[in-house]
């Protein structure tokens, strides 16, 4: 990567100037000289010099790497212009994943209650979690993707109770999770709901004993059909009943009780409970005390989350795993009493949970620190995201106001089919093209925005072939693929024939790896999504460039040598778009 090599050279020169820092090199503004630039304002105080003088001194001291043509001080920046042939060679270099580095990153996402169909709110969780897992793997991390199955929770108990209580019989046609979800909604609308609580409690206890696992699994398998349709990937399923059976909660609480900040008050409102004082880690709390174990001996969900986190990071052991029989994910493993012992011992975790769970996630990190693992607490990340509206409406599964992911997929595919029919009536496989476009529209809309901002999914906007959409990027890929298909094979490119148009496109291609690394480091896919939008726009500008009313960048009819250069650039662009889309879990159609 030329940018990182330039950063290394600058860091070495600054070290010789007495400032051992590494500054980030960024693209220079288009109205300024140079391709890249480094800001030097932050060094003014330490060096007691104006930034302009620092820029000149750095230029004088810096041995320019061979791929840099010149360094130009611009105010408080030092800008760099790359040699065109070096720039082109780097842009044409085949893309490959970064070298693997040690240490497991565990990404937990989806983790939907196994009691009904997935709704629109779950879409963002799945799209974000799956994309960040793919991005991290490409960036050189060993990634494990985990889906947590809360089979001992109240929601699962209520659904199983409702199916029996109302004597509901599945017709074999309706998707089973939708059938189960209707029973759940019916129970919550039942005026006798409060009177039924003791019977629901009996089902809950049966779930805790692991007696109704197959009934829960039936709902889970139906949910997994949706996850598979969304192109999400998983490595492990962890069932809460197995966590209970393995005694992880008791082990975690015993470990925490060794801390002076975890105790059992003898009087006051917390009398008899096991309480954690989070104030040493989370200062400024109005009430720093959090109950882990109630006075009646029942655990709070804080405590369960903490125990699970301790297992993820190798502090506790006790879960066993075996292959999971299902038609969607051949290599998937599930926790089970009869499996083989396994602990991931992750050095870093990312829990994809909506922003409303920020406080519980902070308590998980606090528990790690108070248990004596402050370094692991720093590596326990929460990828928080805001809610999703559908055409301006808020969702509520309990009230039956949610729109299912299956319905969104079906409607988006129906609309995409009409668009494909209109734009390309001779398309060889309209159904597959519609599926790809629909998936691209849905998943891209869920990751293109910064996670902490609310999004409003609207079909017409998301499916547009123009603007900041998945289909816009997919269409750019298909256009590039069409040119390559017509070209057949070609010879070696003549880099010396490059025009400013090729140079500009090559410079944008160089930003791909930087976008991947930034998305991985910041743990947010929207950085990569925005890069793909910018690259697609750059490609469209290149494709449509005109001079004196004539096409300025013809590819197939260009002179020999330049034709090969342009084809090679188009190929690099096509591969970059395809790789980038795949890292977001989106297919790259060859024909649209």
Swiss-Prot record:
One of its GO terms (biological process) is arginyl-tRNA aminoacylation. Keywords: Aminoacyl-tRNA synthetase, ATP-binding, Cytoplasm, Ligase, Nucleotide-binding, Protein biosynthesis. Its main location: cytoplasm. It is found in: Cytoplasm. The keyword Metal-binding does not apply. Its EC number is 6.1.1.19. It is an enzyme of class 6 (ligase). GO terms for cellular component: cytoplasm. A motif ('HIGH' region) lies at residues 112-122. It catalyses: tRNA(Arg) + L-arginine + ATP = L-arginyl-tRNA(Arg) + AMP + diphosphate. CDD domains: Anticodon_Ia_Arg. GO terms for molecular function: arginine-tRNA ligase activity; ATP binding. Belongs to the class-I aminoacyl-tRNA synthetase family. NCBIfam families: PRK01611.3-4. Monomer. This is Arginine--tRNA ligase. The lineage of its organism: Bacteria, Thermotogati, Deinococcota, Deinococci, Thermales. The gene is argS.
């Amino acid at each position: 990567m030329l940018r990182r090599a330039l950063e290394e050279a600058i860091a070495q020169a600054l070290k010789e100037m007495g400032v051992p820092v590494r500054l980030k090199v960024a693209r220079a503004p288009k109205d300024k000289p140079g391709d890249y630039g480094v800001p030097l304002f932050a060094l003014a105080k330490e060096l007691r010099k104006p930034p302009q003088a620092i820029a000149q001194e750095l230029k004088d001291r810096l041995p320019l790497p061979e791929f840099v043509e010149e360094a130009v001080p611009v105010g408080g920046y030092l800008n760099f212009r790359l040699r065109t042939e070096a720039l082109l060679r780097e842009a044409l270099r085949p893309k490959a994943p970064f070298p693997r580095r040690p240490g497991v990153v565990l990404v937990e996402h989806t983790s939907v209650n196994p009691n009904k169909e997935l709704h629109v709110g779950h879409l963002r969780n799945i799209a974000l979690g799956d994309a960040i897992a793919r991005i991290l793997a490409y960036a050189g991390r060993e990634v494990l993707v985990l889906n947590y199955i809360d089979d001992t929770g109240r929601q699962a108990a209520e659904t199983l109770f409702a199916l029996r209580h109302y004597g509901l019989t599945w017709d074999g046609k309706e998707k089973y999770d939708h059938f189960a979800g209707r029973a759940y909604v019916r129970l919550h609308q039942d005026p006798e709901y409060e009177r039924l609580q003791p019977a629901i409690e009996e089902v809950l206890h049966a779930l805790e004993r692991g007696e109704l696992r197959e009934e829960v699994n039936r709902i889970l398998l139906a949910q997994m059909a949706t996850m598979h349709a969304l192109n999400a990937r998983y490595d492990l399923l962890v069932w809460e009943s197995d966590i209970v059976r393995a005694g992880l909660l008791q082990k975690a609480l015993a470990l925490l009780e060794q801390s002076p900040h975890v105790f059992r008050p003898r009087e006051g409102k917390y009398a008899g409970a096991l309480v954690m004082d989070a104030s040493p880690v989370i200062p400024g709390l109005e009430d720093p005390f959090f109950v882990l174990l109630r006075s009646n001996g029942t655990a709070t969900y804080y405590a369960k989350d903490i125990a699970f986190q301790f297992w993820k990071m190798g502090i506790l052991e006790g879960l066993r795993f075996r292959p999971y029989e299902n038609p969607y994910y051949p290599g998937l493993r599930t926790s089970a009493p009869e499996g083989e012992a396994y602990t991931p011992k992750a050095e870093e975790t990312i829990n994809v949970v909506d922003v409303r769970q920020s406080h519980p996630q902070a308590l998980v990190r606090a528990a790690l620190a108070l248990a004596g693992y402050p370094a692991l607490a720093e590596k326990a990340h929460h990828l928080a995201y805001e809610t999703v509206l559908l055409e301006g409406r808020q969702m509520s599964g309990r009230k039956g106001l949610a729109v299912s992911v299956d319905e969104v997929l079906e409607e988006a595919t129906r609309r995409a089919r009409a668009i494909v029919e209109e734009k390309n009536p001779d398309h060889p496989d309209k159904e597959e093209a519609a599926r790809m476009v629909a998936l691209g529209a849905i998943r891209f809309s869920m990751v293109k925005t910064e996670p902490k901002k609310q999004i409003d999914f609207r079909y017409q906007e998301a499916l547009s072939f123009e603007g900041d959409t998945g289909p816009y990027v997919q269409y750019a890929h298909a256009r590039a693929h069409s040119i390559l298909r017509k070209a057949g094979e070609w010879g070696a490119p003549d880099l010396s024939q490059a025009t400013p148009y090729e140079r500009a496109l090559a410079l944008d291609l160089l930003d791909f790896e930087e976008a991947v690394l930034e998305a991985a480091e910041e743990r947010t896919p929207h950085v990569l999504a925005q890069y793909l939008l910018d690259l697609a726009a750059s490609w469209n500008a290149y494709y449509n460039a005109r001079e004196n009313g004539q096409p300025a960048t013809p590819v197939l009819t260009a002179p020999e040598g330049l034709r090969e250069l342009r084809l090679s650039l188009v190929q690099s662009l096509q591969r970059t778009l395809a790789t980038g889309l795949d890292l977001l879990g989106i297919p790259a159609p060859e024909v649209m």
